[in-house]
A protein has these predicted regions:
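N-terminal binding-site loop/beta-alpha segment at the start of enzyme catalytic domains
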Residues: 1-80, 143
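Surface-exposed, flexible loop/turn segments at secondary-structure boundaries
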Residues: 12, 24, 61, 88-90, ...
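Proline-rich low-complexity regions
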Residues: 14, 74, 87-88, 107
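Hydrophobic faces of well-ordered beta-strands that scaffold small-molecule active sites
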Residues: 14-18, 53-55, 80-84, 113-118, ...
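Active-site mouth loops of central-metabolism enzymes
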Residues: 22-36, 85-96, 124-127
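Structural motif corresponding to the early beta-alpha repeats
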Residues: 59, 75-94, 119
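Glycine/proline-rich, positively charged
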Residues: 91-162
């Protein structure tokens, strides 16, 4: 697997990552993850050099994070990058932002996220991000070592970014 050095760091990230939004399910009408098959996929990806694993709070109805944490537990923590995302639109107040973040760490069974994104930002979510001081909170988590790299995913017109 080809890897690229991340910016001016020693971190090397695989060109392909494993997204955990569409893991195999036990049936067509459920979000329940087929853990045995999904573990095979994680192990195959890892054994073939994939070291970037991407999840989010709501993937698989909330089951993706509790799956991927234990699925990666057998591997040295520094050998892979785990990314998750803050569902800004789900948070009603600043306390909920903190609760969701800490819940994600616990569900993933990690002390930090290598990459942490504000998820699915658009005009409305940007306003909520500001109102709830999400960026300030995440910067604090970064200073505390609970986030290594901070970013966002964006789903709106380019003009919104201006």
């Amino acid at each position: 697997m080809e890897k690229r050095r991340y910016k001016n760091t020693a971190l090397e990230v695989s060109l392909l990552g494993l997204g955990c939004m569409r893991l195999p399910k036990v049936g067509p009408d459920t979000e329940e993850i087929d853990k045995a098959r999904a573990q095979e996929i994680v192990d195959y990806a890892y054994s073939h050099g994939v070291n970037y694993f991407d999840t989010a709070y709501m993937y698989h109805g909330g089951a993706s994070e509790p799956f991927i944490g234990p699925a990666l537990k057998k591997y040295p923590r520094e050998s892979y990058c785990l990314a998750s995302k803050m569902p800004v639109w789900m948070c009603k107040d600043e306390a909920e932002v903190e609760r969701v973040f800490n819940e994600q760490l616990a569900k993933c069974q990690v002390d930090y996220f290598d990459f942490y994104l504000c998820h699915s930002l658009n005009k409305d979510h940007f306003e909520r991000l500001e109102k709830l001081h999400v960026y300030d909170f995440l910067q604090r988590m970064k200073k505390e070592g609970k986030i290594r790299r901070l970013g966002f995913s964006f789903h709106d017109k380019p003009e919104v970014l201006r």
